[in-house]
């Protein structure tokens, strides 16, 4: 439903909804964070045979200039399948930009140079393709499926970026260089860096982060 860009339906019985499964798709006030277009199959899935059994079904959609790809493999599939995400199968990527791929399940990022993944029967994987914006590139709030929909870029420059949070959670961005400094409108910053991936823990809706080199 999240990748479709459409409404979100809940069919649980009264009192049986698990809130932890809803928070990744909503803002603090209950508004749905959804993609801005209609979910469509990637071009390779249009002509492939036995999709969902021998090849994952991949659906893509957009939020801003980020592209989200969800991959699905039917439970009746006999084994795990290896597949790839190619820019040529994603209309809108023919601009010569550099891209990152963020794996929402592994919480890991790679610079796009062709992307291969493995999916098991019954699994659904979510990948976020992010155009590089220089020294700093926003991923967004990683506790939300549509991560960049939960944070707003107020300013993007070579040596400074300003982001405003639209929900609570953990904010993540990519830094190509060392020596990154982050300040917050709250005065408190819990910054964790793992390689190029930087995470500011426990941000709040309305909080503004300023990142400088």
Regions found by a protein language model. Give the residues of each.
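Active-site-proximal substrate-binding groove within the catalytic cores of carbohydrate-active enzymes
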Residues: 1-136
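Non-catalytic C-terminal accessory domains or segments of carbohydrate-active enzymes
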Residues: 45-48, 67-71, 105-213
């Amino acid at each position: 439903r999240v990748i479709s860009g459409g409404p979100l339906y809940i069919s649980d019985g009264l009192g049986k909804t698990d809130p932890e499964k809803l928070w990744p798709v909503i803002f603090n006030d209950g508004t749905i964070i959804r993609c801005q277009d209609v979910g469509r199959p990637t071009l390779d899935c249009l002509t492939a045979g036995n999709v969902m059994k021998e090849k994952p079904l991949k659906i893509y959609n957009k939020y801003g200039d980020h592209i989200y790809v969800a991959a699905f493999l039917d439970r009746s599939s006999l084994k795990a399948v290896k597949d790839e995400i190619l820019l040529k199968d994603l209309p809108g990527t023919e601009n010569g930009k550099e891209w990152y791929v963020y794996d929402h399940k592994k919480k890991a990022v790679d610079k796009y140079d062709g992307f291969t993944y493995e999916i098991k029967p019954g699994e659904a994987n979510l990948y976020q393709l992010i155009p590089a914006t220089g020294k700093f590139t926003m991923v967004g709030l990683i506790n939300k499926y549509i991560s960049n929909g939960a944070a707003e870029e107020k300013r993007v420059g070579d040596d400074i970026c300003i982001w405003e949070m639209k929900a609570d959670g953990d904010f993540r961005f990519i830094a190509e260089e060392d020596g990154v400094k982050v300040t917050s409108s709250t005065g408190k910053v819990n910054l964790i860096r793992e390689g190029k991936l930087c995470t500011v823990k426990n941000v709040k809706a309305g909080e503004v982060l300023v990142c400088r080199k």
